[in-house]
Amino acid sequence: MFILTETAAGYAIFKAKDKLLKKRDALIEDLKSPEGASNLLKLQSFAKFESTVDALDNVSALVEGKVSSKLSSLLEGLSDSKSSTLVVADPKLGNAINKLPGLEFEIISDSSVQDLYRGIREHLSSLISGLAPSDLNAMSLGLSHSLSRHKLKFSPDKVDTMIVQAIALLDDLDKELNTYAMRVREWYGWHFPEMGKIIQDNLAYARVIKAMGMRTKCSETDFSDILPEEIEATLKSAAEISMGTEITEEDLDNIVMLADQVLELASYRAQLSEYLRNRMQAIAPNLTALVGELVGARLIAHAGSLMNLAKQPASTIQILGAEKALFRALKTKHSTPKYGLIYHASLVGQANSKNKGKIARVLATKAALSLRVDALSDKDTTNGNIGLENRIRVENRLRSLEGGKLLPLPTAPVQQSKVQINGTSAYSTATDAVTKDAEESQEDVEMDIVIEKKKKKSSKLKEADGESSKKEKKEKKDKKHKKSKRKSEESEDGESPKKKKKSKKSKD
């Protein structure tokens, strides 16, 4: 019986008696000491890993239940031995070894081998000569770090984390930026209240504060890089007749520091928005082309990952983000919401209030198709052609609802076939002189068949008409016969039926 053991240093195969696993209680007692383990198990062969990269490749294959080339070559060396039993710790690995050609082993990988492997791992340094416990611990630690790094690097869900965190931070920055900008306006408004109505843009407001300082310096300051000429002239004239209070230099320093914070946050927000756009274009290009990077990122963040969102049906994508309204409507038995986060897409915004629900439903359907291409396609889809085509289809649907002109669909490039077949694959009838006559005769036969069918049909109709006419004539004759019989009876009595009725009434 051979026992396959995977270590951080390499593959080890131990040889033991076949009856070892049957005496489980005795096995546990014997494996308590290194001497007992050495008496039971003998090292048959040991394949050492050449480097850390080699160890990582082999251990990654073991985790997936695959047989590496090093392990396969090691097992081939056991094919000449008389023993046909191989003990393996992982059942998946045992099934993979069974499928290898040329190896005929009876694989044992049930719960009975757990005590055996527990004893081997405990006395591994004594069973393998030249392997110190400190070296084995260092190898195990390094290999575990490499394996964890490898799993994190190739995890498909970790890529979506960047989008989820970026869109969450972008929303937080918008709130902070709006709060700081309003605080600057309120604070500096005590000194120059007219400036808030003249300058509407928050960033321009903060830049003017940094450039001007006190409002008394407004006439001396050049705002050509910040404001247009008309607004600059209005601002300077308003500064001369302002009704604001006076502030100290210390107050102004704090206001300027807050204005610096607003400008820094705005700069970082623009950088983060560009990062999110590039990341969405790389991960979900078709969804980005259809609904935009912000709406697409919010949909992915709400679902948790791109794969989770791709598994959702179109009806769920349509109302994603409106769960509270949906459950409230179901509870109160009112109409359910027509859209959720997808409402903020530009295509839904272009539609009027009557058609927003229809466009949201169509857009959710196309978004579901684009998502599945982005998440599951093996081909390179970074160009986003499917998303652009779906966007044109949704726009055409919107134009058809609102009576606009339809847009032409993009034509996909025609791919030439890899194999071009020249020549004829069957007999060519074009070179046959008899073909034309045969075709004409065939056409004549078909025409004759059609004419005969028409004749039969017309004859059946005539027969049916004849029978119906005979019935009508017979009914008319019967009616005439009844009338004549009734008249003859009346003439014999000498009174009409009306007179008979009157006479009966008079007698009564």
From Swiss-Prot:
Residues with PTM Phosphoserine: S33, S441
Biased composition regions of type Acidic residues, renumbered to the chain: 440-449
Gene Ontology molecular-function annotations: snoRNA binding
Stored Pfam families: Nop, NOP5NT
GO biological process: snoRNA guided rRNA 2'-O-methylation
Composition skew (Basic residues), residue ranges: 473-486, 498-508
Keyword tags: Nucleus, Phosphoprotein, Ribonucleoprotein, Ribosome biogenesis, rRNA processing
Top-rank taxon, per record: Eukaryota
Region (Disordered): 426-508
InterPro entries: Nop56/Nop58, NOP58/56_N, Nop_C, Nop_dom, Nop_dom_sf, NOSIC
Stated name of the protein: Nucleolar protein 58
Gene that specifies this protein: nop58
